[in-house]
Amino acid sequence: MDSQSSILEENLEKILRGEGLEFDSVAEQVDPVTLRKNVCYIVGAVIFNSKEEVLMVQEAKRECYGRWYLPAGRMEECESILEALQREVREEAGIDCQPITLLLVQEQGPRWVRFIFLAEETGGSLKTTAEADDESLQAHWWDRKSPLPLRAHDILSLIDAGLKYRRNPWFPVTQPVDFPCHVVCQRLFLTFISSRADADDRLWLLMSNNNTSHHPRLPIVVSFRTYISKAVSKLIEDCMPSSYISVHIRGILGVQHNGRIPGKTDGICFNTLVLLENTEEGAEIGSPPSLETDCYRWQEVTNQGLKAKIIERIKDGSVLPFQSL
């Protein structure tokens, strides 16, 4: 195996483990994003006690005063995602927590990205009405059966997802990793599986030719004002406009963020698993779709162990869910 193939396989393994890779560059010149100016990140926690009651907080905001919601709030300058989560839970509910895993990422473009965690209580005590402030009125454990006026019903599916993961995890524990990035982008783990009755499945990965590091690199797409997920479709339209293919964003393999230097490291890099499928009737599927640009190339994954891991993650859906709302 040559050194380039070895580096690529090592990097792919890191991404599959959720470790992330240093963010190097994007092809175009893009201004850095700034938290609470042109990007907004929200953290929320799903926390259960031993009775599988879920932690809820009573809102103090005028527009939803007295209603109940999961502990959640906006990230602040110089915070990591985990620090923001722990601060919000402490301020709103009075307890300390430790994240177990990211449970879901939701987005409406870079101006609204929400990170939902499954977490556990590690200390402190539930906030009481005597401690009410601008953050919340009180906190308590909800059995999910007793009537409770909710601020919004979107949290019910989040609570269900937390219970499901507690009982039967369907993707590996995923925590944000500390790598600085100046934009909101995706590193695409973009795959194509060619299947033939007379041969084993073959797996292909899209690789970038815009490479200043001289090492094999996965494509990176930047999101501006529109949905983050649309950046994937745009890349496909640009490099395979004549192909009849469907694009399936399977989910997130890793989240990279630093945030220590306001206006310079407020970006996020999502390592996103994508599957392309040929939809043309009678199409030859022994090879991936033809590329109509020199910016990218297909590379076959020939390491059998690595190929098996990737195909398993694709077919099992064993990735952090990613929702565009």
Curated annotation (Swiss-Prot):
Per the record's keyword annotation, is Magnesium included, yes or no?
yes
Note the PROSITE patterns from the entry.
NUDIX, NUDIX_BOX
User: Per the database record, which ranges form the Nudix hydrolase domain?
Assistant: 38-163
Indicate which residues form the motif Nudix box. 73-94
Names of the cofactor(s): Mn(2+); Mg(2+)
For this protein, the record's InterPro entries field holds: NUDIX_hydrolase-like_dom_sf (IPR015797), NUDIX_hydrolase_CS (IPR020084), NUDIX_hydrolase_dom (IPR000086), NUDT18_NUDIX (IPR042970)
* Keywords recorded for this protein, A-Z: Hydrolase, Magnesium, Manganese, Metal-binding, Nucleotide metabolism
Binding of Mg(2+), residues: L55
Q: Give the record's GO biological process terms.
A: dADP catabolic process; dGDP catabolic process; GDP catabolic process
List the catalytic activities from the record: 8-oxo-dGDP + H2O = 8-oxo-dGMP + phosphate + H(+); 8-oxo-dADP + H2O = 8-oxo-dAMP + phosphate + H(+); 2-oxo-dADP + H2O = 2-oxo-dAMP + phosphate + H(+); 8-oxo-GDP + H2O = 8-oxo-GMP + phosphate + H(+)
Record-linked Pfam families? NUDIX
Q: Which SUPFAM superfamilies match?
A: Nudix
* Enzyme Commission no: 3.6.1.58
Give a GO molecular function annotation for the protein: metal ion binding
Q: Does the keyword DNA repair apply?
A: no
Q: Which of the seven top EC classes does this enzyme belong to?
A: hydrolase
Give the source's domain of life in one word: Eukaryota
Q: Function, please?
A: Mediates the hydrolysis of oxidized nucleoside diphosphate derivatives. Hydrolyzes 8-oxo-7,8-dihydroguanine (8-oxo-Gua)-containing deoxyribo- and ribonucleoside diphosphates to the monophosphates. Hydrolyzes 8-oxo-dGDP and 8-oxo-GDP with the same efficiencies. Also hydrolyzes 8-OH-dADP and 2-OH-dADP. Exhibited no or minimal hydrolysis activity against 8-oxo-dGTP, 8-oxo-GTP, dGTP, GTP, dGDP and GDP. Probably removes oxidized guanine nucleotides from both the DNA and RNA precursor pools.
Report the sequence similarity comment from the record: Belongs to the Nudix hydrolase family.
PANTHER family xref list: 8-OXO-DGDP PHOSPHATASE NUDT18 (PTHR22769:SF56), MUTT/NUDIX HYDROLASE (PTHR22769)
What name is this protein filed under? 8-oxo-dGDP phosphatase NUDT18
Q: Which organism is it from?
A: Danio rerio
